[in-house]
Amino acid sequence: MNYDKFVLLFSIATLCVLFSLMFMGGYVSSSGVGLSCPDWPLCPHGLVPSTEFLIEYTHRTIAASTGLLVLLSTVFVLRSKNSVRSTRLFSIIAAAAVVGQIALGATVITEKLHAVLVTAHLGLGLILYSSLIFVVINTYYTNLKPKPYSLSSAAGTSSSGKKKSPAGYSSNKSTNL
């Protein structure tokens, strides 16, 4: 597998994990369990919480995984020789957004789910998600989408005007049809 394909597949996987995080965050928010784990970053009773904290703790665990995946995606995009400027830019925006989400998520908990902060957390999450969608689409279209054939290749001639054999090799013989 070439590096660009790896970057694309890794970015798609990151996008899927991010979607599950946003889904879980919506559930945490709407079910009212956002403060069931009032400490940050851990819950009471140590690293592995009791079942009453499980939903919120699952959201935090997925968030930590997502943060790592987004940062790794950014590193992979920046290391790719074929990434265009806009892909790199949106990858950096995604990395900055994930760092902002971590800080904002902690603030949401310490400020006891203040409505403005919860809304900002959702808004920044949408920016993060949109940025990653752009990275995935742009990586595909700039690096991996098959290039269209030129008229000369469709006509069976090479760029030098020589007739191609069925195997695609140019022939030195001039044939009159």
Annotate each language-model stretch with its function.
Residues 1-177:
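Polytopic transmembrane helical bundles with strong interfacial aromatic enrichment
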